[in-house]
Amino acid sequence: MRSIFNELADEQGFRRVELSEYHRYRDLHGAALLRELGLPLRKLPRVMNSMRRRMADHRGTLSLFPGIADALHRLAVSGVQLAIVSSNSRENVERFLGRDNAGLIGCYACGVSMFGKASKLRQVLRRSAVQHQYAIYIGDEIRDAEAAKAAGIAFGAVTWGQHSQEALRAQRPAEIFATVADMSDKLS
């Protein structure tokens, strides 16, 4: 993902994310991150669309975090209704998951705008007939926590993704999952 982002940075004139700086960016959110990268908000939709297209082109080089496939199967077998709300396209999400894993997902809401996840979360709850008090939205970004709060559902933070554990802890998640196994153990 970083390499795809850096390709776009070079083409569109904003700052690259070097590996040595990556951990510093994990604590930044929203406007602060865009400001640090020199990426104007007006360019964000175009950059996100380009990211989606490039991710589709690079699908063979992207893979799930170790243990995710097993966790999805374990959760599905235990009766957990799985859904995905993502700003990425459904096609990219399904390709990324692979056919077997994608088949475990009961509801998709993909292609969501960067700041439109809360309404999609509410829509997924209605479509799946899950009451908000029984739902948890698992994510790795501060905006995931904000969307869950706006939708009136619990947020579970995973520490192996976009934002740091400290940044996510500040959002007061219902659960913090340090490992994939920790997530599947607590939820199944």
Name each region found by the language model.
Residues M1-A69, V77:
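N-terminal helical cap/lid subdomain that shapes the substrate entry/recognition surface
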Residues D100-Y108, A167-L187:
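Structural recognition of alpha->loop->beta junctions
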Residues I136-A178:
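Acidic, Mg2+-coordinating phosphoryl-transfer loop and its flanking beta/alpha structural elements
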Residues Y25, P66-G67, N88-S89, V112, ...:
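Short beta->alpha linker loops
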Residues L39, S78-V80, I153, P173:
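Short phosphate-binding/catalytic loops that engage adenosine nucleotides
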Residues A56-L97, A118-S119:
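Short, acidic loop-to-helix structural element flanking the phosphoryl-transfer center
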Residues S20-Y22, G103-G116:
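A short, structured active-site edge motif that brings together acidic residues
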